[in-house]
Amino acid sequence: MSESALEEVAALSAIYCRDGECEVLSSSVNGITVMIQTGVQGITGSEIHLKLIFDLPVEYPSSLPNISVSSEELTRAQRKDLRDKLVEQAKQHILEPMIHDLVVWTQQNLNNLIVQPEPSILEGHFPLSLDTITEETTWTILLRLDHMRAKSKYVKTVEKWTNDLKLCGRLMFLGKLILILLQGDRKSTRDYLVLQKTCKVDVDSSGKKCKEKMISVLCETILPLKQKRFTTFEVKEYSSVSDLQKEFEAAGLQTIFSEFVQALF
């Protein structure tokens, strides 16, 4: 497998870190098989559970992955239609890591694929292409780190990565809580996750350089076009939960705080 493919699998494990979300089904000289489990709220309000299986050949991403779709809520025809659309999307992004973007595309477009209503019913809203998702939208991701043993070096590394990738946001410290809030385009946030998961950014208990193994993605969402966004990346320390909450509220992210941060205290 290519180094970029192995890095992508590591990044997928970091992004889909909840129990059962991401699983490497097999790994051999012939390639890697990865399963992503996700859910999409249907138009009736009920959740559609999906299992997306990607067989990554040794030549991936120079060769396309083999894709299969499993869901008890979808008919056989709907599963085939979704698979065919994913293959079409994958062909547009040959030579580059694509699995996470294909999952996001599925989450964004599944209901339109199932229902296929008239354009007038959709009021002009059509399925988003991967290009639209990755290049024309701003994403917000919230990460949690367990600890930083080599804090000064770690912070400088994060600052360098965000600067190189033109990401804005905050590295936030409150007691033992460490959060990284990032805003930027899809490719840059994805590239950051790959760096965060695959580079030696800290030291272990013996002082030896090590990769980040205790990171979780708390939230990942598209920022509404009219919502204000961060213009810089800053490292900040807070003295109270109230101060941290005000930071989120000032950025228009109070919902993210209440749904993903408040429960950490």
Swiss-Prot record:
InterPro entries: RWD_dom, RWDD3, UBQ-conjugating_enzyme/RWD
Protein purpose: Enhancer of SUMO conjugation. Increases SUMO conjugation to proteins by promoting the: binding of E1 and E2 enzymes, thioester linkage between SUMO and ube2i/ubc9 and transfer of SUMO to specific target proteins which include hif1a, pias, nfkbia, nr3c1 and top1. Has no effect on ubiquitination.
Protein name per UniProt: RWD domain-containing protein 3
Pfam families in alphabetical order: RWD
UniProt main location, coarse: nucleus
Keyword Cytoplasm: yes
GO CC terms of this entry: cytoplasm; nucleus
Record key words, sorted: Cytoplasm, Nucleus
Species this protein is from: Xenopus tropicalis (Western clawed frog)
Domains: entry comment: The RWD domain is required for the sumoylation enhancement activity.
Any single GO BP term: positive regulation of protein sumoylation
Cellular location(s): Nucleus; Cytoplasm
PANTHER family: RWD DOMAIN-CONTAINING PROTEIN 3
SUPFAM superfamilies: UBC-like
Domain RWD: 7-114
